[in-house]
Amino acid sequence: MVEWNAVNIFCSRCENSKLRTVDAGSKKVCDKCKTELFPRVDPVVIMLPIFNEKCLLGRQKIFPPRMYSALAGFLEPGETIEDAVVREVKEEVGLNVNSVEYKFTQPWPFSSQLMIGCFSNVDDDKTNLDEDEIEHAVWLSREDINRIFVGKSPDRIWIPPAMAVAHQLIVCLLYTSPSPRDGL
């Protein structure tokens, strides 16, 4: 927010009026032409592909050793949440999604993102990784996830911390069953 306020000083519509900061810095207003300006928010889908009661976690090259997380990607212009989930799962791990179940959102203010958490039921468990995106992926059962939470994962796998959407999706999966649906 500090950076956004620092770079948005003048009105983009009438170009010669200074903007006034309101609502604790979350909005700017031009007193001359009444234009309101809000910070940009980039929507991101983050999802757990699910097949036969197991979820798929992926590992990017930039992750710390042995860390795995949910898959994620930005929504493209004109795309629905469901379309983005289908596209990202197909692009990153080569799986076909047959249903998407929205779970929750979380603002991620430090990079101006809105994280949209979903479960995605897939047709099978045969991955084809885009190695530019995902270095390795692993299917985990609820029992495997429980072992990770108590520090007894045989591969010493770990997941993002509790504040992260990926962590919350994994916890949600432990305590609920994704609803099977035909199609999207």
Language-model region placement:
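N-terminal strand-loop-strand
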Residues: 28-70, 74, 96-99, 120-122
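Conserved adenosine/adenylate-binding substructure
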Residues: 162-170
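Single conserved hydrophobic/aromatic residue that forms the stacking wall/gate
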Residues: 175-184
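Short, contiguous, pocket-lining structural segments
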Residues: 2-6, 39, 60-62, 76-81
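Short glycine/proline-enriched turns and hinge-like loops at secondary-structure junctions
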Residues: 23-24, 41-42, 69, 112-113, ...
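Cys/His-rich short segments
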Residues: 2-46
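Unchanged
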Residues: 75-162
